[in-house]
Amino acid sequence: MDQSLIQEILEIVEQAAIASATLSGKGLKDEADALAVDAMRKRMNQINMQGKIVIGEGERDEAPMLYIGEEVGTGNGPGVDFAVDPCEGTNLCAYSQRGSMAVLAASDRGGLFNAPDFYMKKLAAPPAAKGKVDIRKSATENIKILSECLGLAPDELTIVVMDRARHKDLIAEIRATGARIQPISDGDVQAAIACGFAGTGTHCLMGIGAAPEGVISAAAMRALGGHFQGQLVYDPAIAQTSEWADMTKEGNLQRLAEMGITDPDKVYEASELACGEHVVFAGSGITDGLLFNGVKFEADCTRTSSLVISNMNNTCSFTTTIHMKDGAQSIALN
C-alpha cells in the first residue's frame, strides 16, 4: 500500500459516514446501515486495487453487499484485505447518540484475522501497559498493573465496559477496586482506540463484544502501539445474548473447528489479529464521539472528522474535510 491508497481509504469511510448521517436521529438503523454499506462499496470499487472483504456484513447468503469474500476495487493494483463496519453503532446513529462511526481496517493480503461472527472477550490499554496487563488476569490484577504503569491511583482510572447483563460481575469487581466505570451501550471500537491516546480520560476497555470489531480495534492498536488482546467466546451461557438463544456450546465449537480454529480458547495478540506487514485503520465520525466529531451538514458544505492510523510511516492523522457543494458561496473555517 502507498500513501495515495491511504488517502482513498480515508475517502471510503468519509463517504460511508456522510451517507449514514443523513438518517441520524430518525430511528432508522437498518436504513442508515444500508446507506453506509452502499456508499462504502461504491467508493471501494473506484479504487485501483484487488480488494477483498474478509470481515463485513455477513456471509454471502446473508448480505447483498460487502459480504465476506466479496471482491472490491477495479481488479488492478495491490491486493488489499478489508475488515469493515460501515456504520458501527447503528442504534447510536438511529437515535443521534454519541459514538457512531464508519470504520475499517486494511492490510496486505492475508494480513487480517478472518474472525467468525462470534463474540470476543477484549482488553485494550495504553502503550505504557502493553505486555504488562493480560486478558488472562483478573480485572483487579489488571487495574493494579494499570495504576502502576500510568502513575494513577485506581480511583483515577476510567474503565469502559459495554452495558450488558453479562458484565454484572465484571462491573462489580472493577468498582470494588475504586476505579470508575464508563458504560457504553454500543460501539466499542472507538473506546478501545481511545485507550491508545493520552488525555482522552479512557484508560482501559474490558469485557465482551463482537469479534469482527475486535479485529478492527486490534489493527488500530497495533499501528498505534497500544495493548489489545482478544479471546473468542463460544459459550452462550457466557455471551448471554438473545441472538444465541438457539445455539449450544458444542455447536459453536463445531463451527469453529469447521473454520479451522483448532484452539478455541487461544488468546490473540493485536499482532496476530492484524498480522500484515502494512496495517491501516480509518474511521470517520457519524455522530460526535470521544475522538472526533460527527458529520456536520451546512448550507454550502458537509464536514467530516476522521482518524487514520498507519504503521507504514507510524502516523496518526486527525482530518477535517470540507466537502464543498456546487455553487458554494461562503465556507466557514470552523
UniProtKB/Swiss-Prot annotation:
UniProt keyword Transmembrane helix present: no
InterPro entries named among the record's database cross-references: FBPase_class-2/SBPase
GO molecular function: fructose 1,6-bisphosphate 1-phosphatase activity; metal ion binding; sedoheptulose-bisphosphatase activity
E.C. designation(s): 3.1.3.11, 3.1.3.37
GTP-binding found in the keyword field: no
Biological role: Catalyzes the hydrolysis of fructose 1,6-bisphosphate (Fru 1,6-P2) and sedoheptulose 1,7-bisphosphate (Sed 1,7-P2) to fructose 6-phosphate and sedoheptulose 7-phosphate, respectively.
CDD domains: FBPase_glpX (cd01516)
Catalytic activity line of the entry: beta-D-fructose 1,6-bisphosphate + H2O = beta-D-fructose 6-phosphate + phosphate; D-sedoheptulose 1,7-bisphosphate + H2O = D-sedoheptulose 7-phosphate + phosphate
Record-level GO BP terms: fructose 1,6-bisphosphate metabolic process; gluconeogenesis; glycerol metabolic process; reductive pentose-phosphate cycle
Name of the protein this chain belongs to: D-fructose 1,6-bisphosphatase class 2/sedoheptulose 1,7-bisphosphatase
Domain of life where this protein originates: Bacteria
Binding site for Mn(2+) 2: 85, 88, 213
Residues where substrate binds: 88-90, 119, 164-166, 186-188
Membrane-spanning ranges: none
NCBIfam families: glpX (TIGR00330)
Family: Belongs to the FBPase class 2 family.
Assembly description: Homotetramer.
GO (cellular component) term, any one: cytosol
Cofactor(s) the record lists: Mn(2+)
Pathway: Carbohydrate biosynthesis; Calvin cycle
Keywords, sorted A to Z: Calvin cycle, Carbohydrate metabolism, Hydrolase, Manganese, Metal-binding
PANTHER family: FRUCTOSE-1,6-BISPHOSPHATASE 1 CLASS 2-RELATED (PTHR30447:SF0), FRUCTOSE-1,6-BISPHOSPHATASE CLASS 2 (PTHR30447)
Binding site for Mn(2+) 1: 33, 57
Pfam families referenced in this protein's UniProt entry, alphabetically: FBPase_glpX
Organism expressing this protein natively: Synechococcus sp. (strain CC9902)
